[in-house]
Amino acid sequence: MFRTLKASQKRSLVNLMFGTTALFATATVIFPSLLPCPAMKNPYLDTQSDPGYEELPENSRVIVIDQQSPKSSLVASKQNNPPSKS
């Protein structure tokens, strides 16, 4: 069904495949710098703002609670409670 290739034909085929692969790899690296993607003009276009987001005062503290770790929830709850006056 398939024909056996001669040594020179095998060498030519391997060289052609290598050259084609090298050409496409080089083109893949070079073309984005020559023809930049028009969708990437502003890198912040795909960010979404939180609908409940409000501008915070300059000296305010933000506490981030990690839901996966029980230790961080404990630390955050201690930070939220003001110290008791004795």
UniProtKB/Swiss-Prot annotation:
Question: Could you tell me the membrane topology recorded for this protein?
Answer: Peripheral membrane protein
Q: Which domain of life is it from?
A: Eukaryota
- Pfam families, per the entry: COA2 (PF17051)
Q: Which InterPro entries match?
A: Coa2
Q: Which GO BP annotation is one of this protein's?
A: mitochondrial cytochrome c oxidase assembly
TM region(s), chain numbering:
none
Q: According to its record, what are the GO cellular component terms?
A: mitochondrial inner membrane; mitochondrial matrix
Q: Which UniProt keywords apply?
A: Membrane, Mitochondrion, Mitochondrion inner membrane
Q: What happens when the gene is disrupted?
A: Elongated cellular morphology at division.
Q: Where in or outside the cell?
A: Mitochondrion inner membrane
- Give the family per the record: Belongs to the COA2 family.
Q: According to its UniProt entry, what is the function of this protein? A: Required for efficient assembly of cytochrome c oxidase in the mitochondrial inner membrane.
> What's the protein name?
Cytochrome c oxidase assembly factor 2
Protein species of origin: Schizosaccharomyces pombe (strain 972 / ATCC 24843) (Fission yeast)
